[in-house]
């Protein structure tokens, strides 16, 4: 029996609660392996017995049988379409509906945040915040999506009084790196940790006596080996991706935490500067 087809075609026959169940199953069929009737009931705000009755209404003995059948139907459908479906990003294909794409993207980002936060060594993080707070000058380096994360952090740090350079041009990044000195900090953002431009800048900064802080993945890399301190990020993106979406999410969680930690260190003055910035920008409207 094709339960997915039956669910799609029987909409007018469903009660309000049954329609909730049907919508859930259609939208999240790819995730059913990890979903129990208890979880479904809690999320939908209905009883478990309603889910069992729904399964029986469709001809299954219970939710477990319906769930396994739906998983089987979904897998068979994927096998048929995989030959023609184009992989757009990570696990997202051209056959996915916008609702499925939204769920996949959200879950990818949620996992990146959860796994990155689980790795935090808060004592080391506090030490890094202290080092940055004492920096005479801060350089932030990054390429592509990492450069966007760096630029966002640079704006935040400038807002609370830090002297920061964050240039997109790699030649300028290298030029700034060689001019750093002891007491300065370079924050290098690279998930792979192997981009030659970023590694070159880190080498130059370290040679000049600056402290190098790397925001990178757990993988062994040239940048990781060069850095005095590392802040680890985790991303579930596969090698095939159209953009560094969950990677950037993980990196932003780290840089936002650094910013708030720095605000907390000097809260009164930082909040005054943030307020002044807000007042000035309001005058531009």
From Swiss-Prot:
PROSITE patterns: HTH_RPIR, SIS. Residues 1-77 form the HTH rpiR-type domain. GO terms for biological process: carbohydrate derivative metabolic process; N-acetylmuramic acid catabolic process; negative regulation of DNA-templated transcription; regulation of carbohydrate catabolic process. Gene3D superfamilies: Glucose-6-phosphate isomerase like protein, domain 1 (3.40.50.10490), Winged helix-like DNA-binding domain superfamily/Winged helix DNA-binding domain (1.10.10.10). Represses the expression of the murPQ operon involved in the uptake and degradation of N-acetylmuramic acid (MurNAc). Binds to two adjacent inverted repeats within the operator region. MurNAc 6-phosphate, the substrate of MurQ, is the specific inducer that weakens binding of MurR to the operator. Homotetramer. PANTHER family: GLUCOKINASE, HTH-TYPE TRANSCRIPTIONAL REGULATOR MURR. This is HTH-type transcriptional regulator MurR. The gene is murR.
